[in-house]
Curated annotation (Swiss-Prot), chain A:
EC number(s) from the headed UniProt entry: 4.6.1.16
Keyword DNA repair belongs to the record: no
Lineage of producing organism: Eukaryota, Fungi, Dikarya, Ascomycota, Saccharomycotina
Coiled coil region boundaries: none
A Gene Ontology BP annotation from the UniProt entry: tRNA-type intron splice site recognition and cleavage
CDD domains from the UniProt entry: tRNA-intron_lyase_C
Catalytic activity: pretRNA = a 3'-half-tRNA molecule with a 5'-OH end + a 5'-half-tRNA molecule with a 2',3'-cyclic phosphate end + an intron with a 2',3'-cyclic phosphate and a 5'-hydroxyl terminus
Species annotation: Eremothecium gossypii (strain ATCC 10895 / CBS 109.51 / FGSC 9923 / NRRL Y-1056) (Yeast)
Recorded family membership: Belongs to the tRNA-intron endonuclease family.
Protein name: tRNA-splicing endonuclease subunit SEN2
Swiss-Prot record, chain B:
Keywords on record: tRNA processing
Annotated Gene Ontology cellular component terms: mitochondrial outer membrane; tRNA-intron endonuclease complex
Gene expressing this chain: SEN54
Assembly with partners or alone: tRNA splicing endonuclease is a heterotetramer composed of SEN2, SEN15, SEN34 and SEN54. Interacts directly with SEN2.
Family designation: Belongs to the SEN54 family.
Name used for this protein in its record: tRNA-splicing endonuclease subunit SEN54
């Protein structure tokens, strides 16, 4: 596993197909022409070996193999590690935790940090509750408000002191747990690769149809997602999602699942390690409508995370028959191209901030 | 991207509509302010208890807070002096209120004066002024046929509210009063000003169909290119093509899914207005109000283009449902306001005069003919605004995407509470945010391509 590498070095390619590097063509040097032509003919954008896609019994699309997972993550941030927050770091983390690697890797501790913070927060809440009880007690006894305030200050100070002390003292917790025996490999120096990279159905389609890097069969993927005899509304819904996904991907956005914020997609500039997502996309049909509570709820959740809500209305430009015909002829990309993306930005408007 | 740049992204983008408007009022401080009367800032509230804990101390705190709040309201001076009393008579026949001799600053933005010098108020204007205590409502009674024989019947606020004939009318009033109280200048679209200004040229000047023809030929010429094109998903594609940079790949990918390009500039706006074909079966939402930001130079007769346009939607009304996309399209098509995304016109009022039409003729010509002084460029404090902040290109691009292009305000009424949503057309398809690795080819040319912005 590579050590911590600067993002700009690690995430050089925004798409899983790497551009070919051709030698410089020098006009007055015929030898360079020959070399250039040779390089052109022998090079290819295609991967030497396509990445195999597995479809689990539960209908999930996964990629296994450390290199493959890493390749998809580093080339456009595709998929999510099943045992990680998003980047499949479980393996490295576990090796790190169990101290199996003699070199001792730092930098894969994102999840640990989260865990630690959650613990601290919980601790604080418990402390606060106990103080609230104490204050109630004091009030019942008829203690003056100013005195209670004094007590509160004292308590806050104590809390802060303890926190500082705790931060200084926390070392690594004892590394090995009982259940770890099952995941340590025979040689005792590594862990079993049980983490998989899971792809959204639209991601799997994109990497199979638009950018052929997955070794997979599109009809099989679709049959798995929609069932063997999908109804037209189901097909349309998938087409809409795919059209939106492809649209944003093709204009340079890094598109990831928006389930965390109750919407369909999140749009990142460049990728999650570099920026927070700036937009949340909800994919809708042009004639689709919900009650106002639906919109305001989504907008609240998204707005609370400092993102802008985009309502992507994906409209079908041709008759339903045409879509069905293309679908059954398995000309999926042409079917997707029947859809057109329209966008509205939904945002709360504050009169006070728009007065001048 | 350096950290400094990232920081500037964070600072530059999250400034405007942050959720920091939830300031509750502390009335005990307010009570002191009423006496001083000169200060306008409200102080922040103190710490809040979450639930009643049954202690006397808490009950006492609550009691004093309530006491000061009601005390503040009760003890301040109320009522109006007889000298400044303005009587407004409700004329049921016209469904308007009449003020025989109107005076006061409200006449700058409200009411219409007829040739007898009487000021006529719309129902919502009437109710708003009654609620404020600016006018006293009277019922105009005609005894027999004699107009002169008026008997003054003073109306109560309840009576005045009873004049609303439908829920829609009441909803519109709620929005009107809310925006009015916040200082905006609000004019109902039911009551157009004497001289209507439009961004769009009158229909007779509509450009001929020739541009359409041109488009056809243009698209025709493009087809041969497509004949030899092997799409990306074709098995042979990678045998025939070599991509030497990521933008080439993106270029190829973006061929597949079409997107709706929304108007970005003056010509596109006008073209869309002329050529846009809309589904006539779609519900036509009413654009209820034109709204101007507070300004002293407002003229009732020639107000010019509004700053915002408002559509009213009552969430609890079973007859109204949230608009679908087609309904949104129809609203966007009818919008006619100061399109704030037009950079070239953002400078001052006088620039807009060159691009708008009043009563069917260019506004500048109209003003000369009617001897109206041209709009003054904003003076004093606004000169600072002219030097609008300029952002680095990549931030400007995101800001543009976030604010969109044409927009309107959807005011949502929920149990009598008004909240606002800004709906804007956006266009992610017209601007690319490709990332190109800088080290790969070593040329600076690549870098500039990735920064390309079509705003």
């Amino acid at each position: 596993m590579a050590k911590r590498v600067a993002g700009s070095k690690r995430y050089v390619h925004p798409l899983p197909i790497e551009p070919v590097v051709l030698p410089p063509l020098i006009a007055h040097n015929p030898l360079s022409w020959v070399y250039w032509v040779l390089a052109y003919v022998t090079s290819s954008n295609q991967l030497p070996r396509k990445i195999p896609l597995e479809v689990g019994a539960d209908g999930r699309y996964t990629v296994t193999g450390r290199e493959q997972m890493q390749y998809l993550w580093e080339h456009g941030f595709f998929g999510t590690g099943q045992l990680s927050r998003s980047e499949p770091t479980w393996q490295a983390r576990t090796v790190d935790r169990l101290q199996l690697d003699t070199e001792g890797i730092a930098g894969h501790k994102l999840e640990q940090v989260t865990q630690l913070r959650r613990k601290q927060r919980l601790e604080f809440k418990r402390e606060r509750a106990s103080f609230e009880r104490k204050r109630l007690e004091l009030r019942r006894q008829g203690v003056l408000e100013s005195e209670i305030l004094e007590q509160e200050r004292l308590w806050l100070k104590q809390l802060r002191d303890r926190e500082l002390q705790w931060e200084a003292s926390t070392g690594d917790p004892s590394p090995v747990r009982a259940e770890d025996a099952e995941i340590i490999a025979e040689d005792g120096a590594s862990v079993l690769p049980i983490e998989k990279l899971e792809l959204m159905p639209v991601e799997a389609l994109f990497l199979t149809l638009a950018l052929p890097v997955l070794h997979a069969d599109a009809p099989a993927i679709l049959a798995r997602t929609l069932g063997p005899q999908p109804a037209l509304p189901q097909i349309e819904r998938l087409c809409r999602l795919y059209a939106a996904y492809h649209h944003y991907r093709s204009h340079g956005w890094c598109v990831r699942s928006g389930i965390k914020f109750g919407c369909d997609f999140l749009l990142y500039r460049r990728g999650p390690p570099f920026h927070h997502a700036e937009f949340s996309v909800m994919v809708l049909a042009p004639d689709e409508r919900h009650d106002y509570t639906w919109y305001s709820t989504v907008a609240r959740v998204v707005g609370g995370a400092q993102k802008t809500l985009v309502l992507a209305y994906v409209a079908r430009r041709a008759a339903a028959d045409q879509l069905a015909a293309l679908w059954h002829a398995r000309r999926y990309m042409e079917a997707f191209a029947l859809f057109e993306v329209h966008e509205l930005v939904y945002r709360r408007w504050l009169p006070g901030k728009n007065r001048e | 991207m350096t950290e400094a740049e990232e920081l500037s992204v964070a600072l530059g983008l999250h400034d405007s509509d942050a959720e920091e408007d939830a300031l509750a009022q502390d009335w005990s401080e307010m009570a002191k302010l009423v006496k001083k009367a000169n200060q306008h800032a409200l102080p922040r509230r103190g710490e809040k208890d979450y639930e009643p804990d049954g202690t006397d101390a808490q009950a006492l705190l609550l009691h004093t807070a309530k006491e000061t709040m009601f005390g503040t309201l009760l003890n301040s001076v109320r009522g109006s002096t007889v000298k400044t009393l303005i009587k407004a008579y409700w004329e049921e026949e016209q469904r308007m209120a009449r003020i025989p001799n109107a005076r006061g600053s409200f006449t700058n933005t409200m009411g219409k004066v007829d040739k007898h010098g009487q000021c006529w108020l719309q129902l919502h204007e009437f109710v708003y002024l009654v609620e404020r205590g600016t006018v006293s409502p009277y019922l105009a009674l005609t005894v027999g046929d004699e107009k002169s024989n008026h008997e003054d019947v003073l109306l109560s606020v309840q009576d005045v509210y009873a004049l609303f004939s439908s829920t829609e009318e009441l909803d519109e009033f709620l929005v009107y009063a809310h925006l009015k109280r916040l200082g905006f200048i609000v004019v109902s679209t039911d009551n157009p000003p004497a001289h209507v200004t439009s961004f769009y040229p009158p229909l007779s000047q509509k450009s001929s169909a020739s541009s359409n023809w041109f488009c056809h030929i243009h698209s025709w010429l493009k087809t041969p290119q497509n004949l030899f094109h092997v799409p990306l998903y074709h098995p042979l594609h990678f045998l025939l093509h070599r991509y030497t940079s990521s933008p080439q790949l993106y270029e190829e990918l973006s061929q597949h899914i079409p997107f709706k390009k929304v108007p970005h500039d003056i010509n596109e706006l006008r073209e869309e207005r002329n050529n846009g074909i809309l589904n006539p079966n779609v519900k036509q939402w009413k654009i209820a109000f034109n709204v101007w930001k507070p300004k002293s130079s407002f003229k009732k007769k020639t107000p010019g283009l509004p700053d915002f346009q408002v559509v009213v939607y009552n969430k609890d009304n079973a007859g109204q449902q949230f608009p679908t996309y087609d309904e949104f399209r129809s609203i966007f098509h009818r919008l006619d306001y100061r399109f704030d995304f037009l950079n070239e016109l953002d400078v001052d009022d006088s620039a807009w005069d060159d691009y708008t039409y009043t009563d069917g003729m260019p506004t500048r010509e109209f003003m000369q003919r009617n001897k109206i002084a041209p709009s003054q460029p904003h003076s004093g404090g606004d000169s600072r605004k002219k030097k609008a902040r300029t952002y680095p290109q990549h931030i400007a691009q995101i800001r543009r995407l976030k604010s969109g292009f044409k927009s309107f305000i959807l005011s949502v009424i929920d149990d009598g509470l008004v909240s606002f949503v800004r709906i804007a057309e956006s266009d992610f398809g017209s601007s690319n945010i490709w990332y190109t690795p800088p080290s790969q080819t070593g040329t600076t040319n690549n870098r500039t391509r990735s920064d390309k912005v079509d705003v």
